[in-house]
Each structure stands twice: as C-alpha cells, then as structure tokens.
Amino acid sequence: MPKIVLEHVTKRYDRFYAVDDLNLVIEDNAFVTLLGPSGCGKTTTLRMIAGLETPTSGKITIGDNVVFDSEEGINVPANKRKVGFLFQNYALWPNMTVYENISFGLTNIKEPLPKINVDARAEAGLLKALKAPNEVVKIVNECYDKKGKLDENKAMIKLIDAYELSQYSAKKLLGYKLHQSKDAKAEAEKLAAELEKQIESARNDAKAKGMELNEDFVYTNNGEVVKEERKLTKEEIDLAVRRVSRIVKIGMFMDRYPAELSGGQQQRVAIARTLAPEPTVLFMDEPLSNLDAKLRLEMRSELQRLHLETGSTFVYVTHDQMEAMTLATRICLIDNGDLQQYDAPLDVYNMPDNLFVADFVGNPAINFIDAKGSQEKDGSFSLDIFDGHKVRFVPNDKIDINEWYANSNAQDQKKADELALKASEKGYVERGNKEKAFKYHIAKVDEFEDYGDEVELTENDFVLGVRPEFINISDKAKLKGEIYSSMPTGMETTVRVAVGPYLLTGVMFGGVVYKIGDKANVEFTGNNVILFSRKNSKFITLGKLEVE
C-alpha cells in the first residue's frame, strides 16, 4: 500500500486559511486519524488528499505518483487516484439491493486490465471444491430445515464463503447434487476429471495463440502480463462483491434493500462498496457518527479488524478523541488549520506538545494547575500552587530550564522569520484567522468570567497537567480537600475534590463510593505529571509532583 506525503499544503478561502502549510507523512499500511474540533481543517485535509478539494498551494504524493503540485500544474482527478471514500451518510441507493449497491462502482470500471480466461479460473475454483466432496456434502446437509427442505440460498452462501466462489460457480456446484449421490467421492472424481480436461484445453488454446496461462489464469506473453482495455466480467464483479461481503459479514443480506437494514448493517454495506474496487487508500469522514454508542463501539472493533485484513492505508477523520485513541496507529491533531501534534496515540496522551493537545485529548479532561517558581540546583522545581501550597516537581530526565527556553525562543524566532519571508513574497494574502494563545481552563468551585487585566507572564510561570488517573485520595496525603461530586460507573468512580476554591478531577478504581461533603486528602501519584510553560504553552517535561 502507498505512502502519502503532503508538502507545504495550504487551502485558503479569501483570507481564511482552512489549512496552513501542512507537512505530513502517512506511512503505508498506517491507520491515521485526523483529529480536532469542528472547523479545524481535518475534513478539508482529507478531501484534498482524495482529490475532492483543490489545494491553494503545495504538493501531494500518493505512492510514487504526484497527484497534486501547484508549481508544476499537476492535479490528478479524484477518480484516477484509486482511493476509496466513506462518508458520514451512507449514501446507499434506496432502490437497489445490497448486492447492486456494492457492485455499482465495479460495473462502471473500464480501464487496461489483465486479460483473463474467466471460464478456466471458475473451473479451477470448482475443481478445488471437488477435491473435498465430503466437505461439500456436509455443508449442503447443514442447510436443510426442520421439514427436510433444502434452503438453497443458505447453501449457496455457505459454499461461496467456504471455497471463495462466485454465485455462478456456487450454483453450478450445488447443481452437481453431490449431497444426493450414493457415492459422492466417485461422482466428484468424474466431474473433476472433466474440469481438468477443460482447463488443459484452455492452456493449449493459449499456447496456440503464442501465449500462456499462469496460475491465476491470466494470459502472459514472454513472462509479461497481457493487458486489454475492458470492463470487469460478471464473474469478476461477483467474486469482488463476495470477497468484501465476507470481510464485513453481510453475505446473508445481498437481496435486501437499505431500508430493511439497521444503521450498523447499512454502514457495513457502505464499507463493502468502498472496498470492492480494491482502493490503495481508504478515506473515512466521521463514518460512525450516525450510530448509537453501543453500535459505534462494535464498529470500531470491526474497523480495526478490517484494517488488519485489507492491509490498506486508512485515513480517518473524527472529532471524537476516544475513536482516535482506540483506532489509530498515529494521531494528527489539527486546530484552526495548524498541525498541533502528529504522534502515536499514547505519546499524544502522555506527552502532549502543548496545552491545547493536553486539554483536547483525554476523558475526563486533564487537570490544569497554575504554578510559579524556579528550578533548584538539583534540577527539581520549587513551585507554588493553589494560592500558597508548596510543591516540588522532580523531572524524569535531566533538564536545564534556561537552555530549554533558549531553544524554544530560537524555534519561535525561526518561525517568525519564515512567516515574514513568506509575507514579503508576491501574491501573499495575510491570514485572517491568526494563531491565538490557547486559553486553558482552571476548574473552580465558583466559576465566573475573569475580565481582569492580562497578567504579564515570565519564564517562572508554569502550568502543571495532571491526568485524573494520577489523582489519589488517601488519609496520608498532605493536600486537604473535600468531595465536591462523585459519579460511580461500576468499577471506577469519577470524583471531583475541592481544594480551597479549586477543583481536581480524579478517577478511582475498585468501585469505591464517596459521599459529597466528606473530607478527602489528595496526592499526585506516578511520574507522569506534565510541566508546561505558561508563557508559550509548550510541553517542557514529565516528572513527579510532591506536596511539601
């Protein structure tokens, strides 16, 4: 499967930059989720890769093919990019059966394809089934109802799935009536001998024309596959439909109409239709958002399995961070048209690049705590939190905060210089939706809008990020508080603890019940507390937090 590369891709609507200077590499066979709030540019990015939206500038490469290049004037149409697109709405034809919906795109394909002896290939499929006649008989006998009548449709579906046959070959196999024969083995051997003769005859005919039939019954000439511009045959279309129906488990619904299916079944049909032409890349734009919570969870599991079985590259758009965390091999988090972080899900969760990423990923949300202080000689940080509580932050890895700020400031200056250079170029349009500092939320007992003056921040201002699972309630803890709310959900309970005017959210495991108003002492466990710069919102390091 191909690698996808985006280089300096920008999409602008007048002064609004939907996507700004995006650089991204999606490795082959990856499952990448484009994550972000509504209107951040994730769907625009997906549509540009698929060819449904034309970028303002930049370059997009799929595999070895450049599909868009603003400088070279290249823009390959969507139907030539060999990609599949799965939409939020299933977009199934209501007047067509499931089979007709899946096969619809296949019937319109006309392009140079390998020349195949379809009859010989079908005969080879039957020959494979006849090598195990007792198994065929067993499958058919399982399809008799209580009245002793054979359910031919059920028998055909089972034969199709067992031997990967088309419906035409399965019908022929059922027509041999091995299940009614006194000696199924002898009858199968007789039929197999006849099929072998026909296959050998097809090979001889190919040789007479100066060609050969390979193992897949594709015509070759001097080892090269012979191609011809043609449409897919009925046999090829049916095999493709049956192949994808096996993957998404909808073989029994082929004769039904969309209105007769549940939401989950309709989504499976839409997935099968997208997979049928064997796209090199599969794009999905919030495909599960119309399903209820239980079905959404089930379909997430199916999509994981689908990715493994097809070996395709998946690019998936969602605003649901739970979907992104559970499905993706890498998360591409976008906000206001800018790439915020591109990493493995656990790296995004544990080591967010900035305050926005930390806030967006995680449920319940991360606890932010304002802190002020400085680094000590031993490398730890002596900080004040919660209006006077003294804490000590011990980094996991050695870090010099002055050196960190010097590197960070140099990066910011380089970015500013690049923007100034771009602004001086002819045709540059100033960005209307400029990047703004993220306003993180400090949870308090009495919430109110703060209209006071902006605080002048220094390099001694920090923000601590503590995930709810690292908040613990213990009698031995030094930070005193009381239970503000308690929400048990079985084996875990989400608790909010008031520490003075501030609120901390924790997740307690083991089915413990807490009573609102009870005293509760809080401590910070583990070494995954995150230290951010309050001045520039960037991630500094991970460490442990000790209350003094």
Ranges and model annotations:
Residues A50:
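Helix-to-loop junction immediately C-terminal to a conserved catalytic motif
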Residues L35-P37:
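The feature captures the beta-strand-to-loop junction immediately N-terminal to the Walker
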Residues V67-G84, N108-A120, L127, K131, ...:
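ABC ATPase NBD coupling module
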Residues V5, V25, T61, N521-E523:
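ABC ATPase nucleotide-binding domain
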